[in-house]
Amino acid sequence: MFDSTLNPLWQRYILAVQEEVKPALGCTEPISLALAAAVAAAELEGPVERVEAWVSPNLMKNGLGVTVPGTGMVGLPIAAALGALGGNANAGLEVLKDATAQAIADAKALLAAGKVSVKIQEPCDEILFSRAKVWNGEKWACVTIVGGHTNIVHIETHNGVVFTQQACVTEGEQESPLTVLSRTTLAEILKFVNEVPFAAIRFILDSAKLNCALSQEGLSGNWGLHIGATLEKQCERGLLAKDLSSSIVIRTSAASDARMGGATLPAMSNSGSGNQGITATMPVVVVAEHFGADDERLARALMLSHLSAIYIHNQLPRLSALCAATTAAMGAAAGMAWLVDGRYETISMAISSMIGDVSGMICDGASNSCAMKVSTSASAAWKAVLMALDDTAVTGNEGIVAHDVEQSIANLCALASHSMQQTDRQIIEIMASKAR
């Protein structure tokens, strides 16, 4: 809980972070479907014998190629099956944290028996939509999630409606802290970070604890594309320098390797994404360690990073064709810049250079290769900080970057929200053709 004596705006900032920065086990799109299946199974009279599911095109895109923790398998069908047979309906984004070896075996058997189907919901106007219907004979239960990864809007069984709420608004519109955040500025966020009592934001240190553990796992195990471990080996071989820049990339990408490779450790997510949480956390942690920052300075830097990432992502669709590791890395750039010199000018220049650098990176679905994009974004963030420290940045005379950082952010988000919709459709079409 936060101090009720804080001014209302700061309270909303803290609430926004508490709502958007949460532990998540596994890639959050398959996990959203697993949660729907788990809640449906909890409502079903009798054991689950069959699972049917429907998801939005964007959720299908992000679920086709990612490993579900503990299963060694990729895709939405195993997520739906395991959610139904071994999920904890009360655990939110950690729905699979208690899944046993027996539950995993049962889920795989259900899949092998052809008792699990996942289809694209048609028509579907929602960007984030998942519906799971579980059966026991003629008895059934159905759960629908819309707008946010854990935002259950409808529960129904063969006996009738159990729960319903309005499902046509977005998660951002439902959450008053995010609505407040949409009306703020980076300068106001920086003032908050500089002046808020440490005790009120100490909780953000949990993001460092969780994501550092995931990073260590990525370096010690053969997860995903093992980018972090590979780059670390190249340092030992003398092909890559053992310096701060390398450490930022290695430790950040290692956490994503483990995350996307199916490690059974939670990530601290940001804006519904584990990779965004990793990207907003690990570069800041590495720089803080380099400068010997104490817990208070680390907490303030992490709060700036996570809150800036949320602030930018809040201007985007929940899922889009824009790789949001890039926007999370803009938050990381802010946090790292604050650690080095703390000036608003340095922070704003770093973010502007990020927008001029990696803003064209597409999201072609969740997969092991996300760690490549995470590593690229982390590297670009530190490069932008180094440029800003030398009073150098992409200027408002170039591309979509404006003279004002707030306008630069708005330009980027307008591009992702409108023009890149066709890009998203093309990506989904290409991925669907590969799956056939």
From Swiss-Prot:
Protein's GO biological process = L-cysteine catabolic process to pyruvate
Pfam families per UniProt: SDH_alpha
GO terms, molecular function: L-cysteine desulfhydrase activity
Which family, according to UniProt? Belongs to the UPF0597 family.
User: Cross-referenced PANTHER family, in alphabetical order?
Assistant: UPF0597 PROTEIN YHAM
Q: What is this protein called?
A: UPF0597 protein YhaM
Native source species: Escherichia coli O127:H6 (strain E2348/69 / EPEC)
The organism's lineage?
Bacteria, Pseudomonadati, Pseudomonadota, Gammaproteobacteria, Enterobacterales
